Regions:
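Bacterial N-terminal signal peptides
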Residues: 7-15
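Acidic, histidine-bearing metal-coordination/catalytic regions of metal-dependent phosphoesterases
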Residues: 18-130
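Positively charged n-region of N-terminal signal peptides that target proteins for export
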Residues: 1-4
Length: 130
């Protein structure tokens, strides 16, 4: 039994050293934090009363001129959602390494103790439902 474990770990260890190109390379800050047309850095938080409002914020590159968010009462299969759409407020932001648009929406009049699903995008390109 010990021989089996020895040979297993030996072959596993040799595989690691046989592929030195699998070592992660360091990207520059400019590339690592580069915004794209697809939404990223999606953050959900509450606004005013957390029982009836939620706020969502996300980032895109500056080619995305409008942001849109959808929210719907969640169901068990996730396919037959009937979302309500909200236009986002879009803000330009310039940092020392890039430029981006930040989008924000406040969902109001939500039912308390109810599970919702939401997604964000530009009306064509969307995140998955969260």
């Amino acid at each position: 039994m010990n021989k089996i474990f020895f040979y297993f770990f030996l072959s596993f260890g040799l595989n690691i050293f046989a592929h030195p190109d699998s070592v992660s390379k360091k990207y520059s800050d400019e590339l690592a934090h580069l915004p794209s047309p697809l939404p990223d850095r999606v953050v959900l938080t509450w606004n005013d009363d957390p029982a009836s409002t939620q706020a969502v914020n996300w980032r895109t590159d500056t080619s995305v001129l409008k942001g849109v968010a959808q929210i719907a009462i969640a169901n068990s299969n996730g396919r037959t959602l009937n979302p309500t759409e909200f236009k986002a407020e879009t803000t330009y932001f310039k940092s020392d390494i890039n430029e981006a648009h930040y989008h924000s929406v406040i969902f109001r009049n939500l039912k308390s103790d109810t599970l919702y699903a939401y997604r964000v995008g530009d009306g064509v390109n969307w995140t998955e439902y969260y």
